[in-house]
Amino acid sequence: MENELFLQKQNFLVLGLAKSGYAAASILHEKGINVVVNDQKAFEENEPAQRLAERGIEVICGEHPTSLFDQHHITILIKNPGIPYENIMVEEAQRRGIPVWTEIELAYYITNAKFIGITGSNGKTTTTTLIYEMLKADSIKTLIAGNIGTVASEVAYHADGDEWIVTELSSFQLMGTHAFRPEIGLILNVFDAHLDYHHSRENYEKAKQNVYLHQLESDTAIVNQSDETVVRLAESGKAGTVPFSVHQELSSGAFIKDGMLMFGDEAILPVDDIVLPGAHNLENILAAVAAAKTAGASNKAIQKVLTSFTGVKHRLQYVTAIQNRKFYNDSKATNILATSKALSAFKAPVILLAGGLDRGNGFDDLKPYMDNVKAVLTFGQTAPKIEKLGNELGIQHVKRVDNVEQAVSAAFALSNEGDVILLSPACASWDQFKTFEERGDMFIDAVHMLK
């Protein structure tokens, strides 16, 4: 009730009309709260803007007029997570001391449902999906939302108070939270990522820290005991902690002991019974078990999921085998760490397809994981850098191609029986694609064209 009264007193400016902006504007309007929308794309070409305008919402397109702040007495700006803080409207809001939200903050304000918030540099989507499936397998009322594709505010708006909203959270989304408080907060790991957006490791960590920062003593922080940064960030909050570790046996929480997945003194199941491929996924699984057990899931439900769940699309996804060559789609590998983990998952010879948006980093950190790589097909802005890496390692076949389709054809031509052909770009997709999903789908389509 207190949150509702707060919202009713505000005048909102929604900046950016991707899915999250459209949902935020729609919800605020439906609740009778003052809202105006601003989007860079021209109105004539902007279908979401046209739909909002038809409902009586004021939409200003094609420019970013700072006069809107005075004209509409704006008190809160909600921005699309991808819009940089250097945007003129964001800078104007900050200059005026106006809070800058993402729609995750709005989601928190409009529901009485409970949140499980999952973030980290890698593994978020897999872990989020695992937690959701584990709770669902136990008939616990559960919804899934956030960076995984379903807009959190939309889910929260229709959620009941006794439901869990399992929410994948990016650093972009978390940077725009100020009071958001998940009853269960989880940081999987923290590595250098998105420094072009956050400008420093410190800012990136601060964004991630928001998962823990506003928790109460009655809440739970799920903590990767093997990640010093996560342990340090967890100390900022008041919540009790439940640890997990893939590297050490613990007295509580989730860990591996004598080949068994444990939660405290409970043996959940043998690690060999888990069907999700890749040693790196054990960390995601342990985190998911810690969160699911905290939320009330039974061992039986967890066992059911872990003996049947084979992965999420675009995350080390097995596509098919053609002439005894196995194809894997790991398009979600948008950084070096994700690709190194993918390479570590295979003992067979690998033909690596990599490349994409150039964020200014090098690729030397991949070198320790390239022993099984017999060929590299590279594309996108980073192709020269990855080509150089392959040549430095003395890999026999290193070839630059124009796109993913050409990479698939060239990889198949170079392959032998028993090889793995792996799309794991180690780069964001935005130089050639709108999303990593689009890139992964192109890979899958190109693979099926080989049949």
Curated annotation (Swiss-Prot):
Q: Which InterPro entries match?
A: Mur-like_cat_sf, Mur_ligase_C, Mur_ligase_C_dom_sf, Mur_ligase_cen, MurD
Q: Which reaction does it catalyse?
A: UDP-N-acetyl-alpha-D-muramoyl-L-alanine + D-glutamate + ATP = UDP-N-acetyl-alpha-D-muramoyl-L-alanyl-D-glutamate + ADP + phosphate + H(+)
Which pathway does this chain act in?
Cell wall biogenesis; peptidoglycan biosynthesis
Query: Which species does the entry assign this protein to?
Result: Bacillus velezensis (strain DSM 23117 / BGSC 10A6 / LMG 26770 / FZB42)
Gene Ontology molecular function terms on file: ATP binding; UDP-N-acetylmuramoylalanine-D-glutamate ligase activity
Q: Does the keyword Translocase apply?
A: no
Protein name listed in UniProt: UDP-N-acetylmuramoylalanine--D-glutamate ligase
Which Gene Ontology cellular component annotation is one that this UniProt entry carries? cytoplasm
Q: What does this protein do?
A: Cell wall formation. Catalyzes the addition of glutamate to the nucleotide precursor UDP-N-acetylmuramoyl-L-alanine (UMA).
Sorted alphabetically, which NCBIfam families does this protein's record hold? murD
Q: What is the lineage of its organism?
A: Bacteria, Bacillati, Bacillota, Bacilli, Bacillales
Q: List the disulfide bonds.
A: none
Coiled-coil region(s): none
- Keywords per UniProt: ATP-binding, Cell cycle, Cell division, Cell shape, Cell wall biogenesis/degradation, Cytoplasm, Ligase, Nucleotide-binding, Peptidoglycan synthesis
